[in-house]
Curated annotation (Swiss-Prot):
It is found in: Endoplasmic reticulum membrane. The chain crosses the membrane at residues 324-344. It catalyses: sphinganine + NADP(+) = 3-oxosphinganine + NADPH + H(+). One of its GO terms (molecular function) is NADPH binding. NADPH binds at G13, S15, G17, R40, K44, D131, L132. This is 3-ketodihydrosphingosine reductase TSC10. Keywords: Endoplasmic reticulum, Lipid metabolism, Membrane, NADP, Nucleotide-binding, Oxidoreductase, Sphingolipid metabolism, Transmembrane, Transmembrane helix. Catalyzes the reduction of 3'-oxosphinganine (3-ketodihydrosphingosine/KDS) to sphinganine (dihydrosphingosine/DHS), the second step of de novo sphingolipid biosynthesis.
Amino acid sequence: MFCLEDQVVLIAGGSQGLGKQFGQKYWDESRHSKIILVSRSDVKLRNAITDITGGRQEPVELVMPEVAASEPSASGSSAINLSKSSNHAGFESELRSNSNRSSSSLKESTNVVTHLTTNAADSRIVYIACDLSDPDAVERMFVTLQHNNLLPTQVLACAGGSIPKLFTDLTAKELEMGVKMNYMTTLFVIHKAAQMVPQAHLILFSSSTAFFPFIGYSQYAPAKVSLKALTSILRHELPNTRISCVYPGNFYSEGYVLEEMSKPDITKSIEGSSYPISCEECCDKIVWWLNRGYDDVTTDSIGWFLMSLDMGLNKHNNNSAYWFVQWLIGVIANLLVVPFYMVLCSYQINKWHKQNKNKNTLL
C-alpha cells in the first residue's frame, strides 16, 4: 500500500528532523527511488545529504530557474504561471507559452537546469533550496522538477516548527512564522502537487495538538488544526488521490530541544506523560501504518486516544487504525471521561494563573 521503492519522493522540510529521517529511510531501504530534499537553507540541505549518504555522494543541487522581470505574477513578483495546469500536458503547454514570451531570461535559466540534468539523473538524492511559504518559489520549484523529469510520485509535507510560549509573550514575527512554517509551506506544495501530479500520494503532517489545542501552543496548534481541516476537504475534492495526514506526538529532534527551552511550565504540566520517542522510531511507525493502508496516522497511544475523541462530521472518510473501536471509545469517553478531565485541566490552568498573579504582586 505504501512503497519506498521505485518512487520519486519530494520531502518538504527535508534538511532536519523528521523530514531528514524520511530521507535516511528512503536512502537505506530503497535502491531505485529518487529522493528530493527541500528547505530554505542550502547549507543545512548539503549537510543533510552528507549525513544521509555517509559522505558517499556529493550533494547535487537542482537550481530553480529565474524568470523574466517583464512577466510579473499576480502577487507582484516574477513567476511562471502554472495555475491553469492541472496535468502534465497543460503544464508543458503553459511552460512553452511562457518560454516564448520571456525567451531570453527563461532560456538562460533553462540552460542552467538542463546542465544539471546529467548529475541529477546519476544521483539518488538531490536537493532544492526553496522558500516553501512563497507560492512563486514553489511554482519555480515544480518547473525545475519538470525539467529534470522528477515530478514526484510521493509528497511528504514535513516542514514546520513550534515556538511554545504564552500568546502575549510571542512577537508578531513569531506568530507570522508559525503560520508560514506550519500551514503555508504545506498548503502551497500540496496545492501545486495536486494540480501537476494528481496521481501522487500526498502526505500532510499535522500534530496530535490538532485534536486537543491547549495553553502554550497558540503559535503552532491553530495551523495544525487547519491542516486537519484541509485534509478533510481535499478528500472530498480529490477522491482519486490518496491523501494521508500524520499526527505525530512528541519526538526527539533539533526542533524539540529548542521547544523545551521556551515551553511554559503549565504546558509541560498538561502534556504530562507524553514522552518523546526517537525520530527514527517516529518515522518507522508512520511508514508501518501507511504501508497497511491507513491514512490517519498517530505515533503514540495518547495521539490515538485523542483522535478517538474527535470522530466528528468529517470523519466519515477517516481511515485510522481500529477506527470502530476509536468511535466507541470516543462516545464513552466524551460522555464519562472528558468532562472530568476538562475540570482537572481548568483547575491546573486557574491555579497557575493565581500563582503567577501572586508573583507579579510581590514584584
